[in-house]
C-alpha cells in the first residue's frame, strides 16, 4: 500500500522572483530526503503562490526499505590474536557498527582474508521518518533572508502555517514554533482559514477560499482572460514571458482587466510608454491589429471581479502619474544641448578609483579608433564612429534617463536624431549597450559594434587595473557580461582581431587618466568567456587545446573547436592527435629560437617532413586547416619510424628539434595538440 504526502509551508508574501525557484528547490529537496531515507515514491508535484510553497508526493511507501549493508574490516591476521581470539581491533570494528563478534565472517579478497560483517536494519514506518521533514524546510536557501520576533534563525519571510498530511492523517511536527496541522490560509482578502481534508483534495480545498495553488493553472487563467479581452475589444496584447511569469507570482487568484489612458500620451516615444507600463506597473501593452500602440493596458488583479471598476480607475490613476513624468521629461530634454551635457560628464564619476565618465569616453574613443583600423570602415563610418565616441553617454544626464534608467541609449538615439546627428551616430549610441545580457540582441551596425567593443574593453581593462576583479559569483560591475559581449560581437561580425595583441596594444596607448595593468589576468578572464561561449557541447580537452593556441582570434577559435569536434568522430583522429602530441612534447625540448639546417638531415624521412612543413600553409576554413594538418600524419609516422630525435650529436638533435618546432609553430595557430585526449 502507498499513500500521498502533502507538505505546505505558508508564509508572508514572497518576492515574485523567488517563488518559482523556491518551489522547484523544495520539490528537489523533498525528493532527495525521501531517497536518502529509503522511502520510495512514484512522483512529486510542486505548487506555489506568493504566500505558500507546497509539495505532494504521489505513491509514497508506508515503510522504508530494509537496509542490508556489508562492512569490510581488518585483515584476518590483525583480527585474530596469537590464541585465535578476536583482537581488540576486531572487537572495536564490530562495536562501531553496533554489532558483536558473532556477526563476523571472513571473506577472501585477492588472496587475503578480511573481516566482514553484514548489518540488517529494518525499515521504519513512513510517519517516523517524516518527523525529520522540518530539516528539509530549514535547508532551503534564498537570495535574501530576514529574522523576526525573537527568532535568530533567518528565513525568506515569516512562517505562518505548516500543513503535513499523509492522505487524511495530519502529522505532528514543528518548524520555527509553528505546529503542523490541517489548517491553511485562504486569499488574504477574499478567503479565510481552510481545512485541507486530504492530500488529494489540496487544490480543490484552496479554491473554495480563492487560491489557485497550481501555477500552471493560474497562468492559463491569465492567458485565457487576456484572450477574451483581445476578442471582445478587437486588440492584440503583447505577452512578454518574463512579465507573465512575474505577474503569475504576484497573485493567488488572477482577474485580468483592461484600462485606458489619454490618447495625448501616444505622442511620447513608444519605448517610454512601454517601460512605464511593463517595467514599472507590471501592465501588458495593448496594440491594434496592425501593431500600433493603443491608449490601453492590461493588468491582473489579485482577486475576483467584484468592484473591478474601482480597481481599473485606481490603476489608470497610477499609470497617468508615470506618463505625466514621461511627457514632461520628453519635452524638457529636447531643450538641452548635447555638447553641454557631454561637458558635464566630467563631473560624473565612472568609478571613484577609475575617474569620470569623460575620461572613460576619452579612452573608449582612442580604442575605437584603433579597432577601426583592424576591420575596415568606409570614410562615412569612420566619421560616425569618431562623433559617436565623443558624445555617446550624453543621455545619462537627461531627465528621462534619470527617471527611467532602462532607456539609456534608447533615448540617446532619439535625442541625437532630434539634434541633427546622423542616423549612423544615433544608432551607435543605442547599440553600444548591446548585448545587455548573455543571450541579448547584438549590435547590427559596424559602427555600433565597434563602439560597444571599445566601451566594454575599456570597462574591463579599467576595473582590472584598479584590482576590482570579479571573484566567485561576485561581479558587481558586470564585467563577465561585458566580456561575454566582446566575445559575442567579435564572433557575430567575424572580426578576427587577435585579442592578445589587441589587449597588448591597449596597454601601450597613452592615457593620462589611467594606466592599464594586470594583462595576464585580463587574458585569463577573456579566455574564460571564450570557453563559456564554446559551451559544454565542446569537450573540455578540445576547449583547453584551442584556448592554448597562439592565434587568439575569437571567430577562428570557435570555428576550430567545432572542426575538432567533427574530426574527433573520424577514424584517423586518434592516431593524428597522438603523433602531433609527440611532436609538441619533443618540441618543448628545443632551444628558444631553433634554426633548421637542411645540411644536417641524415635520411629521406627528415627531408620529406621538412618539405611537408614548408608546403603547409593552413588555408581555408577551420575544417580544411585541420584536414591539411592531419594529412601530414603518414609523413610524421615515417619520420619517427626512421629517425631518433634525441641523439648524442647535439647539432643533429637540435636540428631535428628545430624541425619539429617549425611544425608546432604552424599547428599551434589552431590548437595545442598535446592537450587533446587521444584515448
UniProtKB/Swiss-Prot annotation:
Keywords: Aminoacyl-tRNA synthetase, ATP-binding, Cytoplasm, Ligase, Nucleotide-binding, Protein biosynthesis. The keyword Aminoacyl-tRNA synthetase applies. GO terms for biological process: arginyl-tRNA aminoacylation; glycyl-tRNA aminoacylation. The lineage of its organism: Bacteria, Bacillati, Bacillota, Bacilli, Lactobacillales. Tetramer of two alpha and two beta subunits. This is Glycine--tRNA ligase beta subunit. The gene is glyS. Its main location: cytoplasm. HAMAP family: Gly_tRNA_synth_beta. Belongs to the class-II aminoacyl-tRNA synthetase family. GO terms for molecular function: arginine-tRNA ligase activity; ATP binding; glycine-tRNA ligase activity.
